[in-house]
Amino acid sequence: MNPPADDMPARCHSYLQQFEAYMQSERQLSAHTVRNYLYELQRGRELLPEGIDLLNVGREHWQQVLAKLHRKGLSPRSLSLWLSAVKQWGEFLLRAGAIELNPAKGLSAPKQAKPLPKNIDVDSLTHLLEIDGNDPLTLRDKAIMELFYSSGLRLAELAALDLSSVQYDQREVRVLGKGNKERIVPVGRYAIDAISAWLECRRQIPCEDNALFVTEKGKRLSHRSIQARMSKWGQEQALSMRVHPHKLRHSFATHMLESSADLRAVQELLGHENLSTTQIYTSLDFQHLAKVYDNAHPRAKKQQDK
């Protein structure tokens, strides 16, 4: 639906109709997307200064509109949609020869804040890892979860492990990470014990290859199967949040930082290319420190009434 034309110059209205047709036919955008673009153009037009319309708008005008929308409380996602609409409008007018420069080119919305990953607290993780049973699947799943939490591996890294990947005497695991970069990661005693218990069962399974973690039929365990089994155990152990591999990786990183505060060491353990990727966990760690401060510092909270 086009913006109302009662107070819009006929030339501008004509270009809007052409823009709508161009989006639908040449760009082959969905009707929903086209409607959104037209709505966003109308939203921006209503905030333009008097005497400025969609054909003579300048970069400074769009900057002012962007600031107004931001002050109105629009989310970064909504601002990005608005910017996409006005940029497409400018590109269309350029192609049509109506303007010489796209006034929206180069404008950017505030970055969307990345949600902090949620970790599982130590007590809940301990409860999760206390699964009981001596059947092969339980022993295998326990070894998988112990290793995830012990070493902070990615799902793909753990699924790709072979029998030769774990060095039991040194308590280390050789991991092939992103970009085929190899790293050596320590493995805790509980994880080593759990893997050893699983291997006693694995030896009884005819296997197609040297995969460390296999199905009952001897095939390498898939990513999806690992995720499903972990989700199952989270439900059976009555955890308050859904359990998945990346959550154990987050928990590993957070708990390591809570204990050591050695950001670069955690970066190496996680296999992060850049330190900035690891720094997100400092936000989580600060949340923990803030709670400790509030509970422990004598002047962090009001004293009880005497």
From Swiss-Prot:
Q: Which GO terms describe its cellular component?
A: cytoplasm; Holliday junction resolvase complex
Under Gene Ontology molecular function, one entry of this record is:
tyrosine-based site-specific recombinase activity
Q: Give a single Pfam family match.
A: Phage_int_SAM_1
Any idea which UniProt keywords this protein has? Cell cycle, Cell division, Chromosome partition, Cytoplasm, DNA integration, DNA recombination, DNA-binding
Q: Which PROSITE patterns match?
A: CB, TYR_RECOMBINASE
Report the active site residues.
Answer: R154, K178, H246, R249, H272, Y281
Asked if the Swiss-Prot or TrEMBL record annotates the protein with the keyword Cell division, the reply is yes
Compartment(s) where it occurs, according to its Swiss-Prot or TrEMBL record: Cytoplasm
Please give the InterPro entries that the UniProt record associates with this protein. CB (IPR044068), DNA_brk_join_enz (IPR011010), Integrase-like_cat_sf (IPR013762), Integrase_catalytic (IPR002104), Integrase_recombinase_N (IPR010998), Integrase_SAM-like_N (IPR004107), Recomb_XerC (IPR011931), Tyrosine_recombinase_XerC/XerD (IPR023009)
- Give the GO biological process terms: cell division; chromosome segregation; DNA recombination; DNA transposition; resolution of DNA recombination intermediates
- Domain spans labelled Core-binding (CB): 10-94
User: Is Lipid metabolism set as a keyword in this record?
Assistant: no
Pinpoint the Tyr recombinase domain residues: 115-294
Q: Which PANTHER family does the record associate with it?
A: PHAGE INTEGRASE-RELATED (PTHR30349), TYROSINE RECOMBINASE XERC (PTHR30349:SF81)
Similarity comment: Belongs to the 'phage' integrase family. XerC subfamily.
How this chain assembles, per its entry, is: Forms a cyclic heterotetrameric complex composed of two molecules of XerC and two molecules of XerD.
User: What is the purpose of this protein?
Assistant: Site-specific tyrosine recombinase, which acts by catalyzing the cutting and rejoining of the recombining DNA molecules. The XerC-XerD complex is essential to convert dimers of the bacterial chromosome into monomers to permit their segregation at cell division. It also contributes to the segregational stability of plasmids.
- Protein name in the entry: Tyrosine recombinase XerC
Taxonomic classification, please?
Bacteria, Pseudomonadati, Pseudomonadota, Gammaproteobacteria, Alteromonadales
